[in-house]
Amino acid sequence: MDPSAAVEKAMEMAEQGAQIIDLGGESTRPGSDFISEEEEIRRVLPVLEKLPTDQFIISIDTTKTKVAQLALEAGAHLINDVSGGSTELLKAAHTYNAGFILMHSQGKPKSMQEQPSYMNTVTEIGEFFDQKKEQIKELGLPRLWVDPGIGFGKTLTHNLEIMRNIHTFLDETWGVLLGSSRKSWIDHLCDAPDPVKRLGGSIASAIDAVAKGVEIIRVHDVSETVQAIQVAKELATDPENK
């Protein structure tokens, strides 16, 4: 995407209610190919340098330490690490006093959906996060979120188990992030092969997650999701206790 077009899209999303803009130069969806560090920097930095870093929070979505360091120097506020808590990325977050998003995944993007397998999906993901807890506490990061990684080495059954039980990942050490928007689990459940036609499923999962205590919802359709969550929260509120 042209840097100017990417900046325009980011500004549009912020105006619609997005509080965090997640910026990434490399696709990590299942089946995607690896790109070089140099290419990722070439894609990301021109966009980041044009974004107003004082108007919203910017998250750099990367698995590469050098990319994260340059992005944080250019004004990004968070590292979104889909690799599962790289020690070097955690150290970079500590060095730059940045927030961190720790995502669970099973396998590499190219092959993660070939044969994902768990004995107990929710328990194993929870144990994965717990194993990182002491290291994270020692670093003293300003903010931390965990992301169970919907679609990253998971079948439809795994994804549904995670979303039904996402409240079990809540912890005083971190908040929880859910990225379920437009993903293939909606197609597998509702026969919606076109990602753009998955708005209903995306919003339903967002409303459910917020009701269960999830702090961050990663979405594509900002205005629709913001409106839906606002209405759902209002309907769930006892007017006598407002």
Place the predicted regions along the sequence by residue.
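Active-site-adjacent loop and "lid" segments of alpha/beta metabolic enzymes
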Residues: 1-9, 28-50, 54-57, 65-66, ...
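Catalytic domains of carbohydrate-active enzymes, especially glycoside hydrolases
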Residues: 8-24, 212-213
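Short strand-loop junctions, especially beta-strand C-caps/beta-turns
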Residues: 149-151
